[in-house]
Amino acid sequence: MTTSTTLGRLAAACAMAGIFSGPALAQASHDAVRIGFITDMSGPYADTDGLGGLEAIRMAVADYGGKVLGKPIEVLSADHQNKADIAATRAREWVDERGLDMLIGGVNSATALSMNKVMAEKKRVYINIGAGTARLTNEECTPYTVHYEYDTVALAKGTASAVIKQGGKSWFFLVADYAFGHSLANDTAAVVKASGGTVVGSIKHPPQSSDLSSFLLQAQASKAQILGLANAGEYTVCAILAAK
């Protein structure tokens, strides 16, 4: 409850800072302040935020009084179905047709990158709360980007370095074949090697895979001490269950 409310208050605060300053003031001259939320509402990452994340945003808006400088706050939401083109199209439509002032992006790094690009083009604030790719922190960060979520560099340094210190020297990666998986595997591998460990192999699985048994057999055959799961949500659960 506290985390969700704090998250939402951050969004409201950024809305005020971004919308009601300088040239952005004219962008919020319509009858309401519109905040969009695009995430996975029905797929493998839906339990990470999904409808729960939407409700948290609505609760935060209510806590804030439902208004910013006398204008009501309206929350729009959509399911990107884990497709970058759908996420980008909806974000663009909301700005052009609904007067969207700020967008909150949920899980899935590929969709987050596409929404980030659209919002930069439209000069609107984009808050990433669910995607972990370090590209949002680094080369694809814009003056309109707020990366509230952790990124894969931070995750890799905190986790891999601790495992190495405990003796986990040889690694094999099971990688979700999209932006987040690639970033996490690459960043973790860099930490492993810099810490004196080795990466004996990796294998990519399609984002749609729910049966990861065959991939895990290859990981087992590698004789690595550590299996690094560079995936998330339902796919991480499936991998853990299959590993049993």
Where are these regions (language model features)?
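A general alpha-helical scaffold signature found inside nucleotide-binding enzyme cores
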Residues: L51-M59, P143, A154
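Beta-alpha junction/loop-to-helix N-cap segments that form part of ligand/metal-binding clefts
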Residues: A32, T48-G53, D63, K67-L136, ...
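Alpha-helical structural signal in soluble globular domains
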Residues: A60-Y64, S114-K122, D187-S195, A242-A243
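Immediate post-signal peptide segment of exported/extracytoplasmic ligand-binding proteins
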Residues: A24-F37, G66-E74, I164-K169
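Gram-negative bacterial Sec-dependent N-terminal signal peptides
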Residues: T2-L25
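Extracellular/periplasmic Venus flytrap/periplasmic-binding protein
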Residues: T89, A134-R135, T142-K244
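Short beta-strand segments enriched in small/hydrophobic residues
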Residues: A32-G50, G106, S170-L174
